[in-house]
């Protein structure tokens, strides 16, 4: 048997180490996991109650149109219900768009490093991947424009960007959209939208009225704390959604996921509280880095990339052996640092204690 050529040599996504895996490996009773940009404060109590209310319906297929969730998201965003595409996480929305637009002979443009699933799915569809290096951790929009041609189908903008946490501002995004050829789909991935507090962070959903080739992606996995349930969505013109819907699998979001997401969306007080606490803790990391001469990218997310000037794997292992899981920059295309999810105050206390210890041992402090 032979798999198709585009899969040969293609590695599956490598998630961070699980808590149980690290406990077993190092014999540690407690682990702090700050590797996957999950919400350290969990999810809304309303979402948990909504899950419990659906437990007697597990034998029944979910609503394939996600009607209740669709109504709530449409109202929340101020768009039509027919402008929404739901996925089993925003990962699946990426997959659907690649399935719908990419093929041999086509190309797709993205930053490097950025969220890896854009590249991964493009390779599976046998499209050419054109990666444009970040400049100071930010998208180089001019260079991205320069590599677009008549065969370009999709341009990806992860905003804020993963793994750097940097963002494209409103003026920059509008200028970019004005210059992108109309045959090119522009996907703005806003997985961390709720965490972005910069005054000039773009409000992209209203731009759908001006740019028919624009798609905005969001997720319930990050600020809403529903990563285990896998719910994400894309927002675009009605025409574009109609065109790509055939590429979506039926029943792709579960009943409990739809119910939890709908309830979570109603609890914006929970989101505001999480964002406020995240921003306060992020400021603590900034002060620590500045006091200790560590470089970092100012972040509009719930994570921070810190450049230690050391092998990222070494920093990763040092923290791992002491019960803290972060993400090595070696796996992210930024080899001299680590990406740290901003945890609770207590979790961050432990991280900063260990990093201080590491800096003393390396005589870097």
From Swiss-Prot:
PANTHER family: HISTIDINOL-PHOSPHATE AMINOTRANSFERASE, HISTIDINOL-PHOSPHATE AMINOTRANSFERASE 2. It catalyses: L-histidinol phosphate + 2-oxoglutarate = 3-(imidazol-4-yl)-2-oxopropyl phosphate + L-glutamate. It is an enzyme of class 2 (transferase). Pathway: Amino-acid biosynthesis; L-histidine biosynthesis; L-histidine from 5-phospho-alpha-D-ribose 1-diphosphate: step 7/9. Its EC number is 2.6.1.9. This is Histidinol-phosphate aminotransferase. Homodimer. GO terms for biological process: L-histidine biosynthetic process. The modification N6-(pyridoxal phosphate)lysine is found at residue 222. Coiled coil: none annotated. SUPFAM superfamilies: PLP-dependent transferases.
